[in-house]
Amino acid sequence: MSAARDVVEVLAGALTDAPDLVRVVESQHQGTTLIELFVASGHAGRVIGKQGRTAAALRALAAAAGEKEGKTVTLEIRDGRP
């Protein structure tokens, strides 16, 4: 488990009314760490935020946490279950 994954999981859980419906999956693709954030359909808007500002902030924090570990991190936010 990476620091970037931990950051995304904690923050996304705090943003939703149902943190137990948040799932984070981490995988490696072509030298990049891909973090997929799955949230329940009704909670996606809270994680994305107005004009995507919350999503952009989550991506920036995940990238910064990954950079500390020498990794390139990409965050994708998805509706539903993994």
What annotation goes with each model-predicted range?
Residues 1-46, 56-82:
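RNA-contacting regions in translation and RNA-metabolism proteins
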Residues 48-52:
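Glycine-centered tight-turn and secondary-structure capping sites
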